[in-house]
Each structure stands twice: as C-alpha cells, then as structure tokens.
C-alpha cells in the first residue's frame, strides 16, 4: 500500500526548482532561533545537501554558529518573509522550514501569513516546528524527487 502511495505522490509532486540540489528556505522567529541552531547543528550534514536561503539574522546564525553556506535575504520584519514568498511563487524554493514562535506577537504578521498561504497555494512542504522540520529534511520523498530531477 505504501508503494502505491509513494508512486502516486511522485507522479503529482516534484521539486519546484530546477536546481541540482533542493532549495530550502529557513526562517526563525527570535524566540526560536536557539532551537533552530541546536536543530541545524545536529542535522548539519543533512542540511549541507540543500541550497539554503534564509532571512537576515537567521542566515547569520546558520553561517556563523553552524557553518552552513547560506544565501541571505533581508530580515523578516523588513520584508524577508515576502522575499521568500516571492521565491516560492517563482518556483525557486522546494521546501520551507519556518520556526514560528506562536506565543509572541509579530508586527509583520501579514507577511508571515502571506508566506504560509503561498506555501499552501504552491504545494510547497512547510515545517513550522522542530518536529515537522525533522520529518521534512528526513523525507525519503525529497530524496526521490531529487533523483527524479537529475
């Protein structure tokens, strides 16, 4: 039964970007940055398999604390979330890892909601916490999509 499901998924979903490696956008609210650094440090070798795009301070942390190569856009409150949403629409992002702090207010909440909506509209995998981020970067489907894109 699982093989039927996997075959069905592969026929309907593919990597959005035409890059050799999947492109992963990473964003973290301030209250979740420490969790992201711990997650990224633990999963460094796996994350190195992706081309990473990140918002300002998140990108700095991933580069400086974890040692990952990162393409940075501006910070989230200054339009970075919208820049990433635009890249999703353009087909330049294959998955989004957005460590959301649900207990804090965010003045740029409309931008955040735009990104979340665009991921759903474009059928882009979206992880909003550590548990789903782990599932996302471990997905055998992403590995199969990667092989199919080659």
Question: Residue spans of the language-model regions?
Answer:
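General beta-strand structural signal in soluble alpha/beta enzymes
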Residues: 53-55, 72-74, 98, 126-132
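Short, solvent-exposed amphipathic alpha-helical segments in soluble enzyme
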Residues: 39-45, 112-114
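Non-catalytic terminal and connector segments of soluble metabolic enzymes
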Residues: 57-59, 106, 112-126, 130, ...
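Mid-chain, well-packed structural core segment of small domains
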Residues: 78-117
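Short, glycine-/small-residue-rich phosphate/pyrophosphate-handling segment
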Residues: 131-150
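Short hydrophobic/aromatic-enriched beta-strand-loop microsegments
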Residues: 51-52, 68-79, 148
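Short internal beta-strands
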Residues: 49-58, 62
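Short active-site oxyanion
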Residues: 24, 45-52, 122-124
């Amino acid at each position: 039964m699982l093989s039927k499901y996997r075959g069905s998924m592969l026929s309907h979903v593919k990597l959005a970007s035409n890059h050799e490696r999947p492109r992963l956008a990473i964003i973290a609210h301030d209250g979740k940055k420490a969790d992201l650094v711990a997650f990224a440090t633990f999963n460094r070798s796996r994350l190195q398999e992706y081309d990473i795009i990140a918002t300002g301070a998140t990108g700095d942390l991933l580069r400086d604390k974890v040692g990952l190569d990162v393409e940075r856009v501006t910070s989230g409150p200054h339009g970075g979330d919208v820049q990433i949403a635009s890249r999703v629409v353009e087909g330049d992002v294959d998955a989004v890892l957005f460590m959301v702090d649900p207990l804090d207010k965010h003045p740029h909440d409309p931008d955040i909601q735009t990104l979340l909506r665009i991921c759903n509209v474009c059928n882009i995998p979206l992880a909003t916490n550590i548990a789903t981020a782990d599932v996302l970067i471990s997905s055998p489907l992403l590995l199969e999509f990667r092989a199919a894109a080659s």
